[in-house]
């Protein structure tokens, strides 16, 4: 049995039903989405979208779409795959992503929760992570400048757009993300004799919505969150971004740090559905 955690699943923007998905693929058995299990940590540090974890999550997501429509086969599956900008800009990487998921034109055969699915991926559209917010708000910023931030688990993407065109010199990503803050907060909790919290509960602590933490500990947690956001601002400033521009923010970190982001940046908008802003934009790119 091989396991992939709920954290990895959510970061790939695929929702599960209650519990885990049992998947058989290429002679292996996987349990995807089991709460509290986070093995394969080496893959959690890999931002490329051409690895086993990402492929399994994408294939599982396709099976779930087929399941929702009472289908078991499809010979024309089209997907959009969002990548960190540094990966997206690497010569040849977009072609690698396309080839990786198209599987040489061969059909995928997968068993999920006792149901067998067969499908062929015919079209793959790579796009970079921080483009999502500006696609969703393109009418508002079609003649203006705007910055987008994607606060992900493993990396933080940023981009400046002028009349919807990305400014290459002011667009890239940092190879760190919200997972580092989660680790810091967990250490603070352990130091204060608060243990055995799930990742979901630690995220609630960061948001300030978890009830069972004392005020002294919360003061330390808030200080860590403020420092994390201030460090982000400092990095963006050092990369010459004009922080007086409107800023659109998506990603899991946007949801967790909303109050601190609004206190730190002058003109910031948290996307209405920050976890899935890039997915929503990807669907629009596919049309």
Give short role names for the model-derived ranges:
Residues 1, 156-160:
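Short beta-strand scaffold segments in enzyme catalytic cores
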Residues 1-148, 166-178, 200-248, 252-287:
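Nucleotide/phosphate-binding catalytic cleft detector across ATP-hydrolyzing
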Residues 149-153:
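Active-site-proximal alpha-helical scaffolds that flank and shape metal-associated catalytic sites
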Residues 154-155, 175:
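Short, catalytically relevant binding-site loops at active-site mouths
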Residues 162-164:
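Short loop/turn segments that connect beta-strands within beta-propeller blades
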Residues 189-192:
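Acidic, metal/cofactor-coordinating or nucleic-acid-engaging core segments within structured domains
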Residues 195-196:
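Short, structured loop/turn "capping" segments at alpha-beta junctions
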């Amino acid at each position: 049995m091989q396991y992939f955690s709920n954290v990895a699943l959510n970061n790939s923007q695929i929702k599960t039903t209650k519990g885990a998905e049992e998947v058989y693929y290429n002679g292996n058995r996987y349990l995807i989405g089991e709460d509290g299990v986070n093995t394969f940590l080496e893959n959690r540090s890999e931002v490329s979208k051409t690895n086993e974890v990402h492929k399994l999550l994408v294939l599982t997501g396709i099976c779930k779409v087929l399941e929702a429509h009472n289908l078991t086969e499809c010979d024309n599956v089209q997907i959009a795959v969002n990548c960190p900008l540094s990966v997206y800009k690497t010569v040849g990487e977009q072609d690698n992503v396309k080839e990786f998921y198209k599987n040489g034109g061969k059909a995928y055969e997968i068993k999920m929760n006792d149901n067998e699915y067969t499908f062929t991926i015919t079209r793959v559209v790579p796009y970079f992570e921080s483009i999502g917010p500006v696609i969703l708000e393109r009418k508002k910023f079609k003649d203006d400048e705007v910055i987008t931030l994607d606060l992900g688990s493993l990396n933080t993407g940023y981009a400046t757009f002028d009349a919807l065109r990305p400014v290459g010199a002011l667009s890239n990503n940092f190879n760190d993300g919200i997972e580092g803050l989660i680790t810091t907060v967990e250490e603070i909790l352990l130091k204060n004799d608060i243990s055995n919290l799930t990742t979901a509960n630690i995220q609630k602590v960061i948001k300030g919505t978890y009830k069972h933490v004392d005020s002294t500990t919360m003061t330390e947690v808030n200080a860590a969150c403020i420092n994390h956001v201030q460090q982000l601002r400092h990095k963006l400033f050092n990369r010459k971004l004009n922080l007086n521009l409107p800023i659109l923010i998506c990603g899991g970190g946007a949801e967790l740090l909303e109050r601190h982001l609004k206190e730190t940046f002058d003109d910031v908008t948290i996307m209405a559905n920050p976890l899935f802003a890039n997915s929503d934009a990807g669907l629009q790119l596919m049309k």
